[in-house]
């Protein structure tokens, strides 16, 4: 389902500005305990597994559309605090990776 939404978004972006260079960034992985009551019980153990598969889904779509790709999970993890979001260091690492990727795209 997420893949369909990403495809629609890329189609719209390319229709709006066909010459734009696009960087598709897949999300970080959920923490192993995210589904527990003390974190976010709206998630399940299966949600953790799905989050780990999203990197491949996004990469396949990036290749299909000929856009650049970065896996956020390659540079940042979910925080211990909530098992769902990045901590400040993770945000900084992801920002640095995006900056580097955009610089590479511009050269």
Regions found by a protein language model. Name each.
Residues 1-107:
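Alpha-helical cap/lid subdomain in secreted, periplasmic
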């Amino acid at each position: 389902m997420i893949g369909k939404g990403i495809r629609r978004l890329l189609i719209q972006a390319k229709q709006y500005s066909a010459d734009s260079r696009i960087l598709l960034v897949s999300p970080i992985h959920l923490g192993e305990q995210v589904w527990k009551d003390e974190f976010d019980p709206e998630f399940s153990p299966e949600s953790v597994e799905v989050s780990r598969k999203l990197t491949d889904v996004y990469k396949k779509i990036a290749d299909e559309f000929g856009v650049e790709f970065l896996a956020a999970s390659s540079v940042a993890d979910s925080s211990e605090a909530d098992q769902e979001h990045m901590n400040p260091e993770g945000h900084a690492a992801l920002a640095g990776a995006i900056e580097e990727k955009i610089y590479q795209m511009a050269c």
